[in-house]
Regions:
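Charged, alpha-helix-forming regions
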Residues: 1-213
Length: 213
């Protein structure tokens, strides 16, 4: 329980510092829309095109990427599904060749933007933005205008790089905790089960009699 609580606390701490780093007042930086600073488009493939041992990563509608033997793009981009599980919450950062589903979006930042800065900003702010923009209580699908009109701060490239360096370190720390703590929790649970079984393993009467003979 302590380890699980620690993991939750660290994630909350990370989110707090990330949001603080990504807080810009109206007059502090130039504000544009995502459509003004990035190319936004979709892919052409369907989920049924996937091949288990395909050569290239294939970003579809699910949380986890698939594989395909052909690629659509060779670039640095932020990818997210247009609908399906985790819509508006799950984002992938890709560098190199990849294939893309027809209902998944690619966001390719222009020269004024550090791609990692755009990635962190979208991960932090996009879901809240689409919830406010949606007429229903839950967002089930994304449309291109949602991306085009998404507000985007444009600090200097130097400042973007400074923020990215900090947030990337936070990401690495959180990832190592997320991977390491569950293993530690599992190990502790196994240890507990072992000692519990040891405590409650009483010798059978026959064994006890034989031992006293």
């Amino acid at each position: 329980a302590e380890l699980t609580a620690e993991l939750t606390a660290r994630k909350k701490q990370y989110n707090y510092y990330r949001d603080k780093l990504l807080s810009f007042e109206e007059g502090d930086v130039e504000w544009r829309t995502l459509g003004e600073v990035a190319i936004i488009g979709t892919g052409s493939h369907d989920t049924q095109d996937a091949i288990a041992d395909g050569e290239y990563v294939f970003y579809a509608r699910g949380r986890d990427p698939l594989r395909l033997n052909e690629f659509d793009f060779d670039e640095t981009a932020i990818i997210t599904a247009g609908d399906g599980a985790g819509v508006g919450k799950v984002f992938h950062y890709v560098q190199g060749k990849y294939a893309l589903h027809q209902r998944a979006y690619r966001i390719v930042p222009g020269t004024a933007m550090n791609p990692r800065f755009v990635y962190h900003w979208i991960r932090s702010k996009f879901y809240t933005y689409i919830q406010k923009a949606s007429v229903s209580s839950s967002v089930t699908s994304l449309r291109r205008p949602m991306f085009l009109n998404f507000p985007m701060p444009v600090p200097s490239i130097t400042e973007q790089g400074r923020i990215v360096a900090i947030l990337d370190k936070f990401d690495a720390l959180t990832e190592s905790l997320t991977e390491g703590l569950p293993r530690e929790i599992e190990l502790r649970q196994k240890q507990y089960a072992y000692y519990r079984d040891l405590l409650f393993s009483f010798p059978k009467p026959e064994a006890a009699s034989a031992a006293s003979a």
